[in-house]
Each structure stands twice: as structure tokens, then as C-alpha cells.
Amino acid sequence: MSGFNFGGTGAPAGGFTFGTAKTATTTPATGFSFSASGTGTGGFNFGTPSQPAATTPSTSLFSLTTQTPTTQTPGFNFGTTPASGGTGFSLGISTPKLSLSNAAATPATANTGSFGLGSSTLTNAISSGSTSNQGTAPTGFVFGSSTTSAPSTGSTGFSFTSGSASQPGASGFSLGSVGSSAQPTALSGSPFTPATLVTTTAGATQPAAAAPTAATTSAGSTLFASIAAAPASSSATGLSLPAPVTTAATPSAGTLGFSLKAPGAAPGASTTSTTTTTTTTTTTAAAAAASTTTTGFALSLKPLVSAGPSSVAATALPASSTAAGTATGPAMTYAQLESLINKWSLELEDQERHFLQQATQVNAWDRTLIENGEKITSLHREVEKVKLDQKRLDQELDFILSQQKELEDLLSPLEESVKEQSGTIYLQHADEEREKTYKLAENIDAQLKRMAQDLKDIIEHLNMAGGPADTSDPLQQICKILNAHMDSLQWVDQSSALLQRRVEEASRVCEGRRKEQERSLRIAFD
């Protein structure tokens, strides 16, 4: 099984395994494994496999390690893996390179692809190849596709893989769509997968097929996945980024699990593939049994068709077949993928910034709306109060109108009676004097009212003047200065009056003395 395994199991597991596998004859697994497994595991293997397996040449474009003749392990291998062949970013010594020639595969080999950007089989990277009749392709966190053809047991766990693998598998949160068939024929590369297989079982693309066997399906806990049976194989699907297999002209039962079909898929076939491969083979073996294609949340990409006819003869199969496959299309490089991711990240940051700006504006608007709502609520309360006051005022006015009507009703007969008696009444002298007195009293009353109003105004003005003055008012400062001048002038006036009185007294004293001296002088001269 594959997935996030943190313990040691008998069979190797693909995907973040931190345990230690102990058996030697087990199936290769792909995924991020941090342990040493029994056989070659594909993916980020940070351990050293302890058990060697069958020796096969490896097909890789870039190898990080030196390979020994054992089972091929594809993927980023950072340990000393005894696997001989694998697809993916391997920057080491590899036997086959890109070729368009015929190649033969040995039995008991497993071609597992993990995080590869090209299409590769056992002997070439673009041409189609035939694999052996025994092998397993468990996938775990694999972006690639693996093709095997014999009965085996594989489990998918958190895999992005797509490919046709002939094994019963239990899927557990597998993000790949694995279609099973009897024999793989054509591998074509998609932007995220080294190869995707298109298998048509009606003699169209089957180089050599073994006797049809019963299909076994074991469904584990799958998410967005559905299991389909094929000859001696089963397929586990679930949330695959590349979608692989097309099967046609056989009794097939296709289950759809929220998949997006590829644009270039054939209308008469049940497709789960993102690539279109046209192959013509002449087979001599028995036809395959009923195959089943399953789809599960396949995010299909544009079909890439690779051109390059090649015929491959399988050595492990009793029948020989000629496969002419055409598959064209460049694979997406890691730099292009990184540039796309960077572009998407920048766009996401711009959208986040724009969203934050809009969120701040929305928050400001929300606060404004809340404040306005509170103001509207208070205004509504005030309006209700005013309405109540208006009702009371209307009632009082109605009461006054009713009183006026009653008064008019009472005065109207009196006015009529006065009009009737006006011709017979003669005014006397006392009546005239009385009227004059009334008019005079009215005038005096009006004058008194005006005087009372004037007194009220004067009192208010005095109260305002006598209150605490505002020192900051320039008019008050001018008033203070004028008051000081007035006080000074009053003091000068008082002082001058006092001085004037003293001068007068002094002048009177001088006059009296002068008169006395004159008298004394007259007496003396006489």
C-alpha cells in the first residue's frame, strides 16, 4: 500500500514512509519515502534499500546516483539505491537515452514514473515500449504514470499518478486516475507526467496479450475515486491531475467520478486520458477480457501527441506484436512550471492586495452605515415624539376652535340685539366722557406696557454687563480702558474742584490781610 506510512511493513509503500521494509521480493513503490524498503521505491527515498531485486537496465535522462542492476526506481533518489532504471530527475549514469529505435524488455520489470517531466519506458523516452508480464506499479504521491501487465498487488495512496497498471489496488485518497489493461502500448508525455497510456483492447493498440483472467477490485477508503476491473488488474482512481486511459470495443463499464474529459478524446471510447495516441498492432495472443475504465476528478490538460513510429518486440511474451505509435508534443520543463507558479503567486498577491483594499473600504462603509443607522434610529425617535406633540397640539387647537364657535354662537344674538337697539339709544354727556376715559386708559396701558418692556431690556442689559466679562473679547478690553480713563477724569475733576476751593480760600485770606495792612498804613500816615 502507499500513502503516509510511518511504520515498517512487509511490503514497500509509496509516499512518506518512515519505517523499514523487511521483505525482499515485494513490489516497488513510488512516493516520498524516508525509509529503506525491500525493493526499489520511487520518489524521494532518503534511505537505502536493503534487498536487491531482479536486474534490469534503467532508462533515465538525469540520474543522481550510480545504478546497479536491480529493479528500477524512478524519482528523486538521494540515497544509494540499487535500482537500475527509473524515470524522473535522475542526474547520473543511465544506460538508455532518448531513442527512436526498437527495444526489447526483459521480464519481471516495473516501470514506475514519479515526478517526471518526460515520457519514458524501459528503453526510450519518446517511443512506445512493451513491458513484461510480471511486475507491480504501486503509486504513492507520484506525478508520473506506470505501466505493467501481470497480476500483482498495488495500492495507491495520495498519488498524482496516471497510467495503466495491471494490478488490484486499494485506493486511499489517491489523486491519480489509474486505468488497468492487459498490455501497455503507447506512452505520451503530458505537462506533469512522464507518460500517459491510451489502451484500446479491440486489436487496435495491443502488442501482445496473455490469456484473459478475472479482474479483482479491492476498494479501500477512496476520496473522489471509483474502482474498475480489467483482466488480471484493477484500477484505483481519485483526484488525478493527469488522466490516462482510453478503452474501446470491449464490454466496458465506465464509472464517472467528477471528471473533466480531455479535449482530444475519441467520442466512441471511454476516455480518462489527457493524451491522444494512435497505434496499429497485429497481435497473435488471445484478446483481453472486459476492461473497465474509471475516472475520478481528473483535471485534464491539453492533449499532447508525440510523433515517432516505433515497433517493439516483447521478449517475455510468447506472441510478437508490431506497434506503430504516434505521439508528439513537448513536455513542460521545470523552469516553465516554476515560472507559471511564480506568475500565479504574483497574481495571487495582487488579488490579495486588491481584496484587502476593498475589505478596508467595505469596513469603512460598514461603519458609516452603522453610524447612519444609529442617527436614523434617533431621528425616528425624535420624529415619534414630535408626532405625539403635534397630536396634542391639534387636540388643543380643536378645543380652542370649539370654544371660539361657542363664543361666536353666544355673541351673534347679542350683536343682533345691539343693532336693533342702536337707533333708539342716544349718547349723553356722561357717556362721552366715559368713552374718552376708556380711550385714555387704553393709551396709558399701552404706554405702560412699552415702558415695562423697555425696563426689562435695560435690566437684561445690566445683568449682562454686571456678569463676568470675557477677557478675550476686544470690546470688553476697550470698555475697561474707557472705564479707567473715566475714573481718571473723575479723579482729576474732583481734585481740580478741591484745588479750586483751596485757591479761593487762599485768595480770600490774602485779600483780608491786604485790607488789614492798608488800614494799618492809613492809620500810620494819618
From Swiss-Prot:
Modified positions (Phosphoserine) in chain numbering: 412, 422
Keyword check for Cell division: no
InterPro entries in UniProt: NSP1/NUP62, Nucleoporin_NSP1_C
GO cellular component assignments: centrosome; cytoplasm; Flemming body; mitotic spindle; nuclear envelope; nuclear membrane; nuclear pore; nucleoplasm
Cell location: Nucleus, Nuclear pore complex; Cytoplasm, Cytoskeleton, Spindle pole; Nucleus envelope; Cytoplasm, Cytoskeleton, Microtubule organizing center, Centrosome
GO terms assigned for molecular function: Hsp70 protein binding; Hsp90 protein binding; nuclear thyroid hormone receptor binding; PTB domain binding; SH2 domain binding; signaling receptor complex adaptor activity; structural constituent of nuclear pore; ubiquitin binding
Stretches the record annotates as Disordered: 43-82, 128-148
Pfam families per the UniProt record, alphabetical: Nsp1_C
Region listing for Required for centrosome localization, in residue ranges: 332-462
Keyword Transport: yes
Segments annotated as Sequence repeats: 6-7, 46-47, 78-79, 115-116, 143-144
Biased composition (Polar residues): 128-137
Modified residues (N-acetylserine): 2
Gene3D superfamilies cross-referenced by the UniProt entry: 1.20.5.170
Entry's Gene Ontology BP terms: cell migration; cell surface receptor signaling pathway; cellular senescence; centriole assembly; mitotic centrosome separation; mitotic metaphase chromosome alignment; mRNA transport; negative regulation of apoptotic process
Region of interest (5 X 2 AA repeats of F-G), residue spans: 6-144
Keywords: Acetylation, Coiled coil, Cytoplasm, Cytoskeleton, Disulfide bond, Glycoprotein, mRNA transport, Nuclear pore complex, Nucleus, Phosphoprotein, Protein transport, Repeat, Translocation, Transport
Transmembrane segments: none
Entry comment on modification after translation: O-glycosylated.
Glycosylation sites: 377, 472
Family that this chain belongs to: Belongs to the nucleoporin NSP1/NUP62 family.
Subunit structure: Component of the p62 complex, a complex at least composed of NUP62, NUP54, and NUP58. Interacts with NUP88. Interacts with NUTF2. Interacts with HIKESHI. Interacts with OSBPL8. Interacts with CAPG. Interacts with SAS6 and TUBG1 at the centrosome. Interacts with MCM3AP.
Comment, domains: Contains FG repeats.
Function statement: Essential component of the nuclear pore complex. The N-terminal is probably involved in nucleocytoplasmic transport. The C-terminal is involved in protein-protein interaction probably via coiled-coil formation, promotes its association with centrosomes and may function in anchorage of p62 to the pore complex. Plays a role in mitotic cell cycle progression by regulating centrosome segregation, centriole maturation and spindle orientation. It might be involved in protein recruitment to the centrosome after nuclear breakdown.
Protein name stated in the entry: Nuclear pore glycoprotein p62
Source species of the chain: Mus musculus (Mouse)
